[in-house]
Amino acid sequence: MTRFFADRTRLLRTAFAFVLMLFILPFGFSEKISDRDFGFSLDVPEGFEVADYTTDGMSYFFSHPNIPVTLVMKICNEPSSRAKDVLKKNLEKLSAKGDTDSFLWNQTPCGISSFTMTLDDNYFGWGVTAPLKIQDYYVLLLCYAPENQKGCEQFIISTINSLCIDAEYLNTPGIITSYAFPSEGKKSVLLTIGGKKIQTSIDKSDLEAAKFTIDLEYAVLNLYANHKLWKEAWQRYYRMIYRDNAGRIQTAAGDIYNELYPELRLKTPQDADIKYAQALLSWVQTFNYERAANSKESDFTSIPASISGKGSDCDSRSMLISILLNYAGLDSAILISREYSHAVVVTDIPAPGQTFTMENGREYLIGETTAKVTWGMIAQDHADRTKWIPVTFNE
């Protein structure tokens, strides 16, 4: 990997330990920050507050009441400029030090930098720039913390990594992860679903990159264990994993769909959706069960690792099915439960059985991934709908 901050990239791949304490927030964001005019969004960790903004609405400063991290979001009008140059120009205005690099994120030229600067204190942080859908406009993100608060780096990376500049690429790896883990070439994967052999592939970097994202987001999630926004933080944790991991198995999702669905539609067109969903459910029910040996690590097995044969638990399996069904145009989500320590998959396929009422008012069919049962069945001791939290992925 030839990157200007190879040492920083090695740090990215290392789990950091937060030494900060979170207390109850008086107010803070628990939903996405979005701009409809320019078409971008940020799914930042819970609790950020607007500290300041410009009257033209083009610059915002966000602070966090419990974590010493500042986020600057600026819309820049820079005709005939490159993303890298826009970032460099703005860092120079702050007398910030650090190299700036350019790279392609979803085929779009972007700028990235890790920097240090001195304002009222000494700070370190990350910055990115990316072009927006309106020509000659860029979004600039700077996220930083005091130099003596290195434990904040995961929080900073997670914040910037949540940027989306095009809804078409919502569920693809984030901007920093994409920079740190460039493609290394295809790796073959052989799947057996419903008795059929399906040859597919992932990228050689996907296992390491997906695990990095999981470790990163798990560190952020742990900050909210006793927080009043724990539920929202938990939902975000799974959204961030889905976004990264779904993008890594799009080839596999297509290969699975093309091998199974057309034949089902030809034989029984009226039942093709539920039969396809059942083939996927029966497949993951055969996976080996595995949880993290270390309680400090996430139990979540990455989706690329799951389809490569590594053991998994209920949440990994549920997310895998959700990715595959969403790829097929069959809306799907997962349900998670703190009380049951369990996860299930749900889908908007009309069929008999147990359902869960989603926020859109529709009844989604429940799928249990760890017991060998059909769609629409759930254990009686897991049937209290108030104990389940929905996590949706296509918003």
Which functions belong to the PLM regions below?
Residues 4-16:
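Bacterial N-terminal signal peptides that target proteins for export
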Residues 40, 48-49, 141-179:
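Surface-exposed amphipathic alpha-helical segments
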Residues 53-140, 148:
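Conserved polar/disulfide-associated segments of primarily extracytoplasmic proteins
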Residues 316-395:
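Hydrophobic/aromatic-rich core segments of domains that either
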Residues 15-24:
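Bacterial N-terminal signal peptides
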